[in-house]
Every structure is written in structure tokens, then in C-alpha cells.
A protein has these predicted regions:
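Long mid-to-C-terminal scaffolding/interaction modules that assemble large complexes
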Residues: 68-155
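Interdomain/boundary linker segments immediately adjacent to catalytic/signaling cores
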Residues: 39-78
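Heptad-repeat positions
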Residues: 1-25
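Proline-directed phosphorylation-rich, low-complexity intrinsically disordered regulatory regions
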Residues: 22-39, 43
Length: 155
């Protein structure tokens, strides 16, 4: 799945470059899932747009960019899967929860009394107790994951 997403992203990048499109340079950081950067920019522009007067040039430009680059919503789906996985059993990772995390793009490593869940890249690793000590553990972990992974969160 990750390889397919990477190839699709390269295809869209080549297609956009050939068409002379694109208003920013992506940089060296690769997307972890399809349209991640697009959704980040869409979220930021949507939130900043309201800071400008409606009839201003900045507002008009932002509106035009948002219309030309619609939100894909992949991040929302990822967060929804993580939420389902972590809040259904108080944070305990049963088979169903693990399957949802894997579907969301996480890998799960078992070791000792904790799981290590990694979102595509070792920089985005979270530790989960195999037996949660309190009922809020799943909600706390969800909050931590949102802070790190959610590119559409409110700024």
C-alpha cells in the first residue's frame, strides 16, 4: 500500500510539473500517505482565510487555491480509524484494534509489557501498554497521536 501511494504521488508530481502547475516546492520530506501535503496546506489556508477581509485580494487568492486543490480527507479517515481502535477497549489493543491501526498505516511491534506502534516512520512512534492501567489511556494515546499525525488539526 505504501509503495502504491508513493508511486501515485510521484505520478501526480510529474504530471503537475509537466503542466506547469504547483505554487510551492515540496522539499525533501516525502508524504507518508497520498495527498498529505495537499491536506495540510488546505487546512492551513482554510484557517488563515478567515483572518482576511472577505473582499481582500488575499482572501480571493486563498479561495481560488482552495477551489483548485480540494481537500482529499485521507488524514480524517486515518484519525477515525485510530479513534475506533483506541477508544473501544479503553486503549487495550485486541485483534480488531490492531487491524484498524494497521489499516490506518501503523506497524505494531510487540516487546515486553508494551507495544510500539509506528506511523510509517520511526520518528512517529508511540508506546502502548499491553494492559492499560486506567480507562483514559486510550484517549490519552489518541490525543498524542493526533498532536503528531493530524495534519488537519486546528492551528
Amino acid at each position: 500500500v505504501a509503495e502504491r501511494d508513493r508511486l501515485r504521488e510521484q505520478f501526480y508530481a510529474i504530471k503537475a510539473k509537466a503542466a506547469g502547475e504547483g505554487f510551492f516546492r515540496r522539499g525533501k520530506e516525502q508524504e507518508l500517505y497520498l495527498n498529505e501535503a495537499n491536506d495540510l496546506l488546505y487546512s492551513i489556508l482554510s484557517q488563515v482565510k478567515i483572518k482576511y477581509p472577505e473582499n481582500s485580494r488575499a482572501s480571493t487568492l486563498i479561495k481560488s487555491m482552495l477551489e483548485a486543490n480540494p481537500r482529499a480527507g485521507a488524514c480524517e479517515e486515518i484519525i477515525k480509524l485510530v479513534q475506533e481502535a483506541l477508544t473501544s477497549n479503553g486503549g487495550k489493543l485486541n485483534k480488531t484494534a490492531k487491524a484498524k491501526l494497521i489499516e490506518a498505516g501503523f506497524s505494531i511491534e510487540e516487546g515486553g509489557s508494551h507495544y510500539k506502534i509506528v506511523f510509517h516512520d520511526s520518528r512517529y512512534m508511540f508506546t502502548v501498554a499491553k494492559t492499560p492501567s486506567e480507562y483514559r489511556e486510550g484517549k490519552n494515546l489518541l490525543s498524542n497521536i493526533r498532536n503528531v499525525v493530524d495534519v488537519e488539526r486546528k492551528i
